[in-house]
Amino acid sequence: MRIILDAMGGDNAPLAPVMGAIQAAKDFGAEIILVGRGEAILEVLKGNGIDTLPEGVEIANADDVVDMHDDPARVIRQKPNSSMVMGLKMLSDGKGDAFISAGSTGALLTGATLLVKRVKGIRRAAMGPAMPNKAGGKTIILDCGANAECTPEFLLQFGLVGSLYAKKNLSVENPKVGLLNIGTEDTKGTPLQKEAYALLKDAGDNGLINFVGNVEGRDVPLGAVDVVVCDGFAGNVLLKSIEGTAMFMGSLMSKMFKKNLLSKLAAMLVMKDIKAFKKLLDYREIGGTPFLGIRKPVIKAHGSSDALAFRNAVHQAMDAVNSDITAELEQMLGSMKENGNDD
């Protein structure tokens, strides 16, 4: 298995992706191709006391870099020799099994769609991060920003691909799928939610997914469902709200434990649990967000990812390769089309 990694993408590149790749190769036995400016990559290695490339790690030179100001729609034509575009081309050409980048989300999504292509029958790829929940598992939220405007058919497909991903990657036997709404009643929401509800319910009645109805935002961190379906605008707001709440709770707890001597002693007694709590909410432990609906695994790492985050993104990519959902998803979509359930 070969994982292609954009060595120039993200706020901490090339240091973080290079060192994360080396750690991942050591810990997981992965073969990793670092795509980027060869001299810059070698300087990182030298600066960290590494004279030669570790076993399993190789460099594919790319002279250019995609930055956040580049127009996503023009990146492929204007920067064909960039680390991101070259990495996606390598994935499309079969020179690797998955691609990871912490670069521009828009450019990565556009490049993945045009170069790697969507799964046959999929109308839009979606960003599907897996968030920890109160039930002890993870909840996939999709879409989380790739598609601000959606049709009911898009939301139906998000439910299908999210359910398959939860089965294959999160080992959930019968994932519960819910539609994000302002209430649980089936009459709630805009025309988009009402029409999507009907399509998802029909898919549930036909045994394609385990659709449990509408869910509210507060139900998501509680683990009421395994997959939350929504448009990219609502999903991104939901995700950022959960992240902000987690940061607030962490800051509040830190202040409480530093208030006086007694609270500091209490903190010492529960320090192990505090560290476990922080780890649970640490985005670096997850790795990145997959673009679901693309033919091969493409993972968007957080822009501020450090070496640990890249290491875990490699592990996440390996899991995605091992639990490939493409064939099963194509079969499901083909069956729906034959039965007239896909408009």
Enumerate the language-model features and the residues they cover.
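Glycine-rich phosphate-binding loop
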Residues: 90-109, 188, 193-195, 199, ...
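Glycine-rich phosphate/diphosphate-binding loop of Rossmann-like nucleotide-binding domains
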Residues: 14-16, 28-33, 39, 51, ...
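Short beta-strand segments
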Residues: 6, 35-36, 58-60, 101-103, ...
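Phosphate/nucleotide-donor binding subsite
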Residues: 50-96
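Glycine-rich phosphate/nucleotide-binding loop
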Residues: 113-137, 141, 224-228, 232-342
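N-terminal phosphate-binding or glycine-rich loops at protein starts, especially the Walker A/P-loop
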Residues: 1-43
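Short, glycine-rich nucleotide/cofactor-binding loops
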Residues: 3-15, 146-156, 300-307
